Amino acid sequence: MLEEAGEVLENVLKASCLPLGFIVFLPAVLLLVAPPLPAADAAHEFTVYRMQQYDLQGQPYGTRNAVLNTEARTVDADVLSRRCVLMRLLDFSYEHYQKALRQSAGAVVIILPRAMAAVPQDVVRQFMEIEPEMLAMETVVPVYFAVEDEALLSIYEQTQAASASQGSASAAEVLLHTATANGFQMVTSGAQSQAVSDWLITSVEGRLTGLGGEDLPTIVIVAHYDAFGVAPWLSLGADSNGSGISVLLELARLFSRLYTYKRTHAAYNLLFFASGGGKFNYQGTKRWLEDSLDHTDSSLLQDNVAFVLCLDTVGRGSHLRLHVSKPPREGTLQHAFLRELETVAAHQFPDVSFSMVHKKINLADDVLAWEHERFAIRRLPAFTLSHLESHRAGPRSSIMDVRSRVDSKTLTRNTRIIAEALTRVIYNLTEKGTPPDMPVFTEQMQVQEEQIDSVMDWLTNQPRAAQLLDKDGTFLSTLEHFLSRYLKDVRQHHVKADKRDPEFVFYDQLKQVMNAYRVKPAIFDLLLALCIGAYLGMAYTAVQHFHVLYKTVQRLLLKAKAQ
């Protein structure tokens, strides 16, 4: 029998039996010569940043889920249920996002360009409008953001092509494509998100004590340092509120020099406060006021506060607006400051449009509009200076608020306006006859654009979401060190949410590693099993009826020789 099998195999290799040779050897040949799938194509690992998840005043916001293990599709696909929907920022719209949620998608991954500064302005404005709407609704669908790279872009394009072909092909083509196409399984490495217990929101206070008696008037300068956006790890907050903190630090530097010399040491206390939790209903300011007004007898806030100046989003545009809850009365120091701002802007910077915006405090709202409202509730005269017309403006809470959105010259100009107006109030220069077009800060005492630039670069070199800034982290220690160079009695204040009725709750798993594995669909395994079964059946039949096969081959060979 073995000799007969050898003879058959020898005959099979002859040209006349080439089709039969294909049948016998083709599967083995294909397995041997098929190139292996490159490792880079088989799997890709990349970092993803989860959408906000927090509770504020007992109200949940953002996504409530972090675990992802499902197949990728683009929004063009007809069926998105239990699929990971990939969207590029340039093609993103709120309607597409809603479509994914309505169809019970397993997850949404939004792919961001590497250079955010190069994103077209119409796309930036549209996404800034969408971000608050995304956060306003609670969703159980995990929502992630990823920064585009070549491999991730290739995954998106392949997935998009597969999704598009399913929508436009015939039923047979769809079935064939479904059985043979490559897919991508998206898997996150982290666990389900959990509430972070005992998280501290930190604020930093410093002061310059005025020259004279104990009962000197106090001017308070406030800016919150934290940033906010739809994804905490992408929240750089360049304009809101990196610009405000930059101005506060520059004012601290300038007035510390003035307060160094007795001749220019004013009879005003200057209290500087870099507040934390500004994007979460100004939690740092709220606790600071409670501690200063209700639980201590030695605070500068208790006696003779002239006014509180809050700085929020002052890094671009040709407008400056003073937002007030109650218009200042004539004869008060806050009214004098308002007039000095108008005077300096009109005479020294005529290209700047200055105005006052009056908005009453709405205590029915879950979140206060501006930081000065925290002080106004405690009957302290306060206002917020900003280039924004409304507290609902998109740049105040967007991941699109990157370094390129802050114009250095504009920020320097606005710093000069604020410094000049404050100085004219503190030293009563207008009453002393100083011309309105004469700048106070010149030569060695001028506002330094290089200093402001370096501070802005430092602030926007890291995300500053409140959930990410630990009290012992480098950011807060650097901020405290910077203030200590110019101010006295610099110290930290901490806020911790109440365990029984917390005003705010943060959650973890905000940054994870996601893996995209190239996979075949389940129907491909079924098709492959059918093909293998058919091949094995043919082989089994050939072995069982080997004598028939042998006689058939012999007959074919004899016929060929006879011809």
UniProtKB/Swiss-Prot annotation:
Glycans are attached at residues 241, 428. This is BOS complex subunit NCLN. It is found in: Endoplasmic reticulum membrane. It comes from Mus musculus. InterPro entries: Nicalin, Peptidase_M28. Belongs to the nicastrin family. Its main location: endoplasmic reticulum. CDD domains: M28_nicalin_like (cd03882). GO terms for biological process: multi-pass transmembrane protein insertion into ER membrane; protein stabilization; regulation of protein complex stability; regulation of protein-containing complex assembly; regulation of signal transduction. Component of the multi-pass translocon (MPT) complex that mediates insertion of multi-pass membrane proteins into the lipid bilayer of membranes. The MPT complex takes over after the SEC61 complex: following membrane insertion of the first few transmembrane segments of proteins by the SEC61 complex, the MPT complex occludes the lateral gate of the SEC61 complex to promote insertion of subsequent transmembrane regions. May antagonize Nodal signaling and subsequent organization of axial structures during mesodermal patterning, via its interaction with NOMO. Component of the back of Sec61 (BOS) complex, composed of NCLN/Nicalin, NOMO1 and TMEM147. The BOS complex is part of the multi-pass translocon (MPT) complex, composed of three subcomplexes, the GEL complex (composed of RAB5IF/OPTI and TMCO1), the BOS complex (composed of NCLN/Nicalin, NOMO1 and TMEM147) and the PAT complex (composed of WDR83OS/Asterix and CCDC47). The MPT complex associates with the SEC61 complex. GO terms for cellular component: endoplasmic reticulum membrane; multi-pass translocon complex. The gene is Ncln. Pfam families: Peptidase_M28. The keyword Disulfide bond does not apply. It is a single-pass membrane protein. Residues 43-522 are lumenal. Residues 544-563 are cytoplasmic.
